[in-house]
């Protein structure tokens, strides 16, 4: 699985200018996602962040490869949790048409924001838990606020819990949980086709909780609530 590395976002079944690029499966040679450039980076005592652009490229065109989608990732890591065995970062992605042609993401069982666990996490050395309390055998294609993957490396457990923002398309999003491979993805296209058009980019936000041991559901629920409805301050004139 050449395409399953770390954290990534790609779609499987798409329609673009009469072709069907598969941006997920790199080995088919018909499409790919590539880094395009760095737009911004900053850091301070509260958070550090960077912004990058990625191109979703159709390789099966009659002429030269053609960029179908421009995707901007804003990644922000928060200075919290280190003394309690966890860290926290957010990814906000904006996916826009690269030109006048729309892209239709077709109904599919997987494809979207994804995460792959360590090679050592195959089989019983990997566990899943969702916000609905589902484990690996029952979680696949259920709709969730968050999903956690954890595994054992040299006898030590650790994991990541990914939280979907309530403003995301089709929230609570379905989640694809693989029966044997240590990966999962949020897959809004499981509920049917959707379009990305020149005048309407797709904006998605996720929070990543990186933790020692297995996830504590109460802690994940609290952090999801903080993500979904952060505290707000208002200045009121007397």
Describe each PLM feature range.
Residues 38-48, 81-85, 152-157, 167-169, ...:
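A short, structured loop/turn motif at beta-sheet edges
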Residues 108-115, 120-190, 195:
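Trp/Gly-enriched beta-strand surface patches
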Residues 161-237:
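Beta-strand-rich recognition/accessory modules
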Residues 59, 98, 211-213:
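Short coil/turn motifs at secondary-structure junctions
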Residues 51-55, 72-74, 92-96, 114-116, ...:
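Residue-level recognition of well-ordered beta-strand positions that form the cores
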Residues 2-85:
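Extended, loop-rich substrate-binding clefts of extracytoplasmic carbohydrate-active enzymes
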Residues 1-18, 115, 196, 205-206, ...:
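N-terminal small-residue-enriched
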Residues 78, 82-127:
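Acidic (Asp/Glu-rich), glycine- and aromatic
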